[in-house]
């Protein structure tokens, strides 16, 4: 049987206080750098997330604005069509009969010496009540000018809103970055 080796007592190498402090400071420095890099990555990730959210909101806003513009355009087009549309089929039939009657009278070889006063009165009445192209034109020009002014105002408002949203988002991101960054040490 072999005898086990006898244990020898070894004394640990002498540790100097200065070497230990340098090592601790170096480890603390490495830990601080690791935290700073981790915080930087975290801030960058959060900023990218906020930018993505902002871009999504901007796209949604532009899509909704486009829908609103198309809706306004369709409304204006419908108003223009309604202004030109004859409202009653009976009026169209009556106008066709009147035109046929006038055509037959004008197309005949017999020329009346005087016009029938009832026809003249009825024609004047129609001209005064239903056929007002100048009034319609003035009204349509006025509505067009109002629509143009409203469109300019809407464009100005949208530009202001976009600028305000952009500045607000930038300020919010700046505040978020300031909150996430480690506090700066000031030397006083």
UniProtKB/Swiss-Prot annotation:
GO BP: any one term: mitotic spindle-templated microtubule nucleation
Compartment list: Cytoplasm, Cytoskeleton, Spindle
Entry keyword set: Cell cycle, Cell division, Coiled coil, Cytoplasm, Cytoskeleton, Microtubule, Mitosis
GO cellular component entries: cytoplasm; HAUS complex; microtubule; spindle
Keyword Nucleotide-binding: no
Cytoplasm keyword on record: yes
Domain of life of the source: Eukaryota
Parts forming coiled coils: 141-163
Function comment: As part of the augmin complex, plays a role in centrosome-independent generation of spindle microtubules. The complex is required for mitotic spindle assembly through its involvement in localizing gamma-tubulin to spindle microtubules.
Quaternary structure and interacting proteins, as annotated: Component of the augmin complex composed of dgt2, dgt3, dgt4, dgt5, dgt6, msd1, msd5 and wac. The complex interacts directly or indirectly with microtubules and is required for centrosome-independent generation of spindle microtubules.
Additional free-text comment from the UniProt record: The name 'dim gamma-tubulin 4' derives from the decreased gamma-tubulin staining of the spindle pole seen following RNAi-mediated knockdown of dgt4 in S2 cells.
Protein name in UniProt: Augmin complex subunit dgt4
Species in which this protein is naturally found: Drosophila melanogaster (Fruit fly)
